[in-house]
């Protein structure tokens, strides 16, 4: 383990891991062409892990204000303080919108947080997860046990491999819900934002089945969101909706979700029919929900005018 760098020497600055700024020593700065001209910074107390997998650079550091932080290729994936907002919303927005989901697939999600949330639903009998990078799984189990606890559920089956290839091999109509917990559409996750992938998702869902996928920031990526919405409206013949929530350590402080259903029993994503109570005590080892509730579920679909105009313009 190495302490965060606090020296201005050129030699030490050259050895800084990805994302740790040499302009402000001891700070992590998230800089990417996905959000040009801006950066979000966290003070680094200690670097806990640095590694390079077959797919990406992986880093974990202890921050002074957000607990431990998981970083992939210089981009924050989660922090202990605010991971609840993302994990709870991407799981419960789809699963609370359909009655008694039984078979769920998670694409990505190697930290285990989505699994933790899916496991709250007692109707679920099978949870498959396909994560391409085993290092993410191993690092999460080591440094984020409260997140990776999802892997301990006996209903979970972990598949290490490419999510696109996995979906193509899935028999038609297998899943009630598919959750795509991907990183940004660059590098290993790029295919998860393209039309052929969504076609495979639709095929793998039962009639009236639902998908929820990470869908970027309305402040930074409306051009990407516009393409995602257009593709989904062509492919999914049920409901197609965009929702969003706040996550302080994500670029612009917000993140969006694309929610779609296949043709079949109608799905009203905006009004949950399968509510999950934060205080239901359904598991002695499961902590209460920190972020999600039925009110915030419905509110997530209320869009600012500039985003609503673009997204509605893609309606059939």
From Swiss-Prot:
Record domain PABS: where: 25-262
Keyword annotations: Polyamine biosynthesis, Spermidine biosynthesis, Transferase
Functional pathway: Amine and polyamine biosynthesis; spermidine biosynthesis; spermidine from putrescine: step 1/1
CC annotations in GO: cytosol
Catalytic activity: S-adenosyl 3-(methylsulfanyl)propylamine + putrescine = S-methyl-5'-thioadenosine + spermidine + H(+)
InterPro entries per record: PABS, PABS_CS, SAM-dependent_MTases_sf, Spermi_synthase, Spermi_synthase_euk, Spermidine_synt_N, Spermidine_synt_N_sf
UniProt-annotated catalytic positions: 181 (proton acceptor)
PANTHER family (UniProt xref): SPERMIDINE SYNTHASE (PTHR11558:SF11), SPERMIDINE/SPERMINE SYNTHASE (PTHR11558)
Family the entry assigns: Belongs to the spermidine/spermine synthase family.
Name by which UniProt lists this protein: Spermidine synthase
UniProt source species: Coffea arabica (Arabian coffee)
Lineage: Eukaryota, Viridiplantae, Streptophyta, Embryophyta, Tracheophyta
């Amino acid at each position: 383990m190495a302490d965060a760098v606090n020296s201005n020497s050129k030699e030490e600055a050259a050895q800084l891991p990805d994302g740790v700024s040499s302009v402000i020593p001891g700070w992590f700065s998230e800089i990417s062409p996905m959000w040009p001209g801006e950066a979000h910074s966290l003070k680094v107390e200690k670097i806990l892990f640095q590694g390079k997998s077959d797919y990406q650079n992986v880093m974990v550091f202890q921050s002074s204000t957000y607990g431990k932080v998981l970083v992939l290729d210089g981009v924050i994936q989660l922090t202990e303080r605010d991971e609840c907002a993302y994990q709870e919303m991407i799981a419960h927005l789809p699963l609370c919108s359909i009655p008694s989901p039984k078979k769920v697939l998670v694409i990505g999600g190697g930290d285990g947080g989505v699994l933790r949330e899916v496991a709250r639903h007692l109707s679920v009998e099978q949870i498959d997860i396909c994560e391409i990078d085993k290092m993410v799984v191993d690092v999460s189990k080591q440094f984020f046990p409260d997140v990776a606890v999802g892997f301990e559920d006996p209903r979970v089956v972990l598949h290490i491999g490419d999510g696109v290839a996995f979906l193509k091999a899935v028999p038609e109509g297998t899943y009630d819900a598919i959750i795509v917990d991907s990183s940004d559409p660059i590098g290993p996750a790029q295919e998860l934002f393209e039309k052929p992938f969504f076609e495979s998702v639709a095929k793998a869902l039962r009639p009236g089945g639902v998908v929820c996928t990470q869908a970027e920031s309305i402040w930074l990526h409306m051009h990407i969101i516009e393409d995602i919405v257009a593709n989904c409206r062509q492919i999914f013949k049920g409901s197609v909706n965009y929702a969003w929530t706040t996550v302080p350590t994500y670029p612009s402080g917000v993140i969006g979700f694309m929610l779609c259903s296949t043709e079949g029993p109608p799905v009203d994503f905006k009004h949950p029919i399968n509510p999950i109570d934060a205080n239901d005590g359904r598991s002695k080892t499961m902590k209460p929900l920190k972020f999600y509730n039925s009110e915030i579920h419905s509110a997530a679909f209320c869009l600012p005018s500039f985003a609503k105009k673009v997204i509605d313009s893609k309606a059939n």
